[in-house]
Amino acid sequence: RYAASVGSDIRIIGEPKTIDNDLVCTDHTLGFGSAARYVASTVREIILDANVYEKNSVTIVEIMGRHAGWLTGASALARRYDGDNPLLIY
């Protein structure tokens, strides 16, 4: 509206983005892919760090996502083979 009111020919397009991937009518949102890759990479590093200890342990990782679990689900990308960690994703 402002551009039109000052006589400018500029056209503006708005593109919603969220790393949570929780917008309706979209397959995926801008920002989700890089956030999912970051989560998977971080979880992989946590797994590698936890594997150096001789004692068995449980590691709990909290991942953001408001009311959507897409980023949490993306942590499964850290798996290298069936049965690899993360074992439980909630």
Where are these regions (language model features)?
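Accessory alpha-helical/coil subdomains and C-terminal extensions
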Residues: 1-9, 29-90
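Short hydrophobic alpha-helical runs that function as membrane-insertion/retention elements
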Residues: 11-13
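Short, ordered loop/turn segments at secondary-structure junctions
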Residues: 15-21
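A broad, low-specificity signal for short, low-complexity segments enriched in glycine/proline
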Residues: 21-22, 78
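Conserved phosphate-handling catalytic cores of large alpha/beta enzymes
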Residues: 25
